[in-house]
């Protein structure tokens, strides 16, 4: 179980020496990455398996963490690749694709994936065969064969398949020997024993900021979708986290002071009278209790850059 953070310590360090605070938090995160990579390398050899499955709910930082683990593996002599399960989305079909209660394409369901193709690729990789990894274009809602890529695994190579459904039975049961990782922002923030900032709020801030920065989606729309995202987590993601060989906490102690400025700016666009204002009544006062840390202290390889931009990794 992860340890909570404490807002009085966070605020004291945010004001006193933000550069040192940020550096220490990033060092702790990178140490966890290195330890995870060492365990993955050891277990993959022991299991004689080349596949790692990395799952976690929205806003967990799966993409950056997977790439940082790959880098750490390479530093200890193991060549690694990352593949997003988003590439395996099937072209929507109103007759067969899962829908939300509102009749929209349910992107939180594992049945959005081309499971037959994905599981076929698992077995092909086990046999040492080449596969062509597809690409799904979310803008056109269709598979784009021009962006497909070949994947071949050598004897000392690993591939990390990362996505919200990587540990779901529909995926993981087809590859029982795979090493399994579950990642999420798992630390609450407390004030003298009282919960003052929930771990799910940390992920919501990440999602709101990322959606506005990278996808042009306003906070009101992200908040509208959040209920369906959370329902999808409870149905399709969280029940499978205890399959994981490692539970990885992606939260950082200095994170909320950094994200605060971006989130407040995004929340300003939620109009008065919007139903989404209800969801902000508890979150906004809690957020305002934090001091600020300038984003200039966030290094380019930080997981936070997945959400605020300016990072070195592709997302």
Where are these regions (language model features)?
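Charged, amphipathic alpha-helical linker segments immediately N-terminal to NTP-binding catalytic cores
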Residues: 1-35
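Post-Walker A helix-loop "phosphate-sensing" segment adjacent to the P-loop in P-loop NTPases
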Residues: 71-81
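Hydrophobic anchor at the beta1->P-loop junction of P-loop NTPases
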Residues: 52-54
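Conserved lysine of the Walker
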Residues: 62
């Amino acid at each position: 179980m992860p340890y909570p953070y404490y807002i009085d310590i966070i605020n004291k360090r945010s004001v006193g020496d933000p550069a040192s605070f940020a550096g220490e938090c990033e060092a702790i995160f990178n140490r966890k990455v290195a330890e995870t990579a060492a365990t993955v390398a050891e277990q993959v050899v022991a299991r004689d398996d080349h596949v790692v499955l990395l799952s976690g709910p929205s806003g967990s930082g799966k993409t950056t963490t997977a790439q940082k683990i790959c880098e750490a593996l390479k530093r200890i002599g193991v060549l690694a690749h990352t593949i997003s399960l988003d590439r395996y989305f099937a072209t929507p079909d109103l007759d067969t694709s899962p829908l939300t209660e509102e009749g929209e394409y349910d992107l939180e369901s594992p049945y959005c994936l081309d499971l037959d193709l994905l599981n076929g690729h698992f077995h092909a990789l086990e046999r040492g065969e080449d596969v062509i990894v597809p690409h799904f274009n979310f803008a056109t809602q269709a598979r784009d064969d021009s962006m497909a890529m070949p994947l071949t695994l050598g004897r000392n190579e690993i591939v990390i398949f990362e996505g919200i459904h990587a540990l779901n039975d529909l995926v993981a049961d087809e590859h029982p020997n795979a090493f399994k990782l579950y990642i999420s922002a798992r630390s609450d923030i407390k004030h003298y024993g009282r919960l003052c900032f929930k771990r799910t709020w940390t992920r919501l801030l990440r999602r709101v900021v990322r959606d506005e920065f990278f996808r042009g989606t306003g906070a009101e729309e992200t908040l509208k979708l959040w209920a369906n995202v959370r329902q999808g987590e409870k149905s399709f993601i969280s029940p499978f986290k205890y399959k994981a060989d490692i539970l990885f906490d992606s939260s950082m102690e200095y994170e909320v002071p950094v994200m605060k400025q971006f989130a407040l700016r995004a929340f300003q666009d939620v109009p008065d009278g919007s139903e989404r204002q209800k969801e902000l009544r508890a979150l906004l006062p809690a957020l305002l209790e934090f001091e600020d840390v300038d984003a200039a202290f966030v290094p380019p390889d930080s997981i936070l850059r997945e959400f605020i931009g300016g990072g070195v990794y592709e997302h």
